[in-house]
C-alpha cells in the first residue's frame, strides 16, 4: 500500500458484531477515518453499532450477508477489509470468505486453531493478492516494546520469566463456545495466545514446550524460548486469584516477572486496536508468518501429554490438586 492509499476512505465489513471485542474494532475503523458498511452476527443485540456506524447494513444470517457483500463487489462498491470477531473455530472459514471476496482481513486472535490451516490461507493469499492480518496488540504496548528493545540490546543473555494471568469467568463460560475445546482451543488458546505471541516476539522462538496442567479452567507449564525459560499459569477460576486481589473485589490478575523484576503492562490497552489498524492500513500489520509460532505453541499445549510435576513449575501449581 502506498502512502496515498492511507488517505483513502476504506470500506469495512465486520463479522461478529455482537461480541465483546467488536466495539474496539468499530472504534478503530472510525478513528482511522474509514467506514463500516456491513455487519453480521446471529445475535441481534448490536445497538452499539449506533455509536459508530448507524448507517451500516446488519445481517443475522450469513447467507444474506454473503449475498450482500457479493452484490457490493459486482456493483463496484466492494468491501476493502473484513474484520473478524467471530468465535475462534470460525475464523478460518471467515478469512476464506474475506479473501474470496477480494478483501483484506483483520482477524482477532487466534487467526486459526491449527497451524496447518495457515498453509492453506497463505496459498489463498497468493491466489487473490489479498492479505490476512491479526490483531497482536501486545506487540504495540509501550512497556513491552521497551522490554523487547532491552532484551535485544542485551545480546545473548538468558532470562527467567514467570507469567500469570487469571481472568475469572462465571458459569456461563463453560456453557458457551468458549468452554468447548474444539471451538475455542481451550484456556491456553482462548486467554493465553496473546501472551505466548508476545513472549515469542520478545524472547525468540520456542525450544521446548512442557505442559504440567491442562484443565477446563486452567493450564500451566514451562515454555523454553531461545532467550528465556518461562513458567506460565493461565486460569479462568476466581479461586486462583491472589488473596489481595480477591479482597479488592477484582476479577483479573496479570503479572510478568523477568529476572525478578515486575513488568507492568496491565494498563495502556485503550487504543491498541486503533494503533493496530493504523499499522494494517499502512501495510505493516502482522501477517500469517508472524502468527505461526504462537499458533503452533498453543496447538502443542492442547495436544501435549502432561509432564510430571517435578523440578521447575509455576508456583501457583502448588495450590492445585495435581501437586
How does the language model describe each region?
Residues 1-55:
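N-terminal Rossmann-like dinucleotide-binding module
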Residues 1-7, 71-73, 81-83, 278-323:
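C-terminal helix-rich "cap/oligomerization" subdomain common to oxidoreductases
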Residues 25, 57-123:
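Beta-loop-alpha module in the N-terminal Rossmann-like domain of NAD(P)-dependent dehydrogenases
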Residues 36, 55, 78-82, 155-158:
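Local beta-strand N-terminus motif with an aromatic residue
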Residues 89, 112-171:
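A contiguous active-site-proximal alpha/beta segment in oxidoreductase catalytic domains
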Residues 171-241, 292-296, 320:
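Rossmann-like dinucleotide-binding domain that binds NAD(P)(H)
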Residues 211-302:
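NAD(P)-dinucleotide binding in Rossmann-like oxidoreductases
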Amino acid at each position: 500500500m502506498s502512502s496515498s492509499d492511507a488517505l483513502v476512505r476504506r470500506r469495512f465489513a465486520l463479522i461478529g458484531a455482537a461480541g465483546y471485542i467488536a466495539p474496539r474494532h468499530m472504534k478503530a475503523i472510525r478513528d482511522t477515518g474509514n467506514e463500516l458498511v456491513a455487519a453480521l452476527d446471529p445475535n441481534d443485540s448490536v445497538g452499539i453499532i449506533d455509536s459508530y456506524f448507524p448507517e451500516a447494513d446488519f445481517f443475522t444470517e450469513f447467507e444474506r450477508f454473503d449475498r450482500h457483500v457479493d452484490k457490493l463487489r459486482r456493483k463496484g462498491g466492494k468491501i476493502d477489509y473484513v474484520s473478524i470477531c467471530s468465535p475462534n473455530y470460525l475464523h478460518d472459514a471467515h478469512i476464506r470468505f474475506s479473501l474470496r471476496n477480494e478483501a483484506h482481513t483483520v482477524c482477532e486472535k487466534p487467526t486459526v486453531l491449527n497451524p496447518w490451516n495457515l498453509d492453506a490461507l497463505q496459498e489463498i493469499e497468493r491466489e487473490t493478492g489479498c492479505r490476512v492480518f491479526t490483531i497482536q496488540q501486545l506487540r504495540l504496548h509501550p512497556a513491552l516494546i521497551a522490554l523487547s528493545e532491552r532484551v535485544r540490546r542485551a545480546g545473548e543473555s538468558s532470562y527467567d520469566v514467570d507469567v500469570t494471568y487469571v481472568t475469572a469467568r462465571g458459569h456461563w463460560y463453560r456453557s458457551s463456545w468458549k468452554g468447548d475445546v474444539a471451538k475455542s482451543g481451550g484456556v491456553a488458546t482462548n486467554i493465553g495466545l496473546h501472551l505466548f505471541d508476545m513472549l515469542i516476539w520478545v524472547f525468540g522462538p520456542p525450544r521446548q514446550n512442557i505442559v504440567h496442567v491442562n484443565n477446563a479452567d486452567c493450564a500451566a507449564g514451562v515454555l523454553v524460548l531461545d532467550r528465556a525459560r518461562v513458567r506460565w499459569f493461565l486460569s479462568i477460576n476466581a479461586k486462583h486469584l491472589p488473596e489481595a486481589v480477591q479482597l479488592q473485589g477484582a476479577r483479573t490478575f496479570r503479572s510478568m516477572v523477568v529476572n525478578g523484576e515486575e513488568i507492568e503492562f496491565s494498563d495502556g490497552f485503550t487504543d491498541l486496536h486503533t494503533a493496530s489498524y493504523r499499522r494494517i492500513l499502512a501495510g505493516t500489520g502482522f501477517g500469517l508468518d508472524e502468527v505461526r509460532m504462537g499458533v503452533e505453541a498453543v496447538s502443542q499445549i492442547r495436544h501435549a501429554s502432561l509432564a510430571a510435576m517435578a523440578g521447575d513449575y509455576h508456583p501457583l501449581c502448588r495450590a492445585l490438586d495435581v501437586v
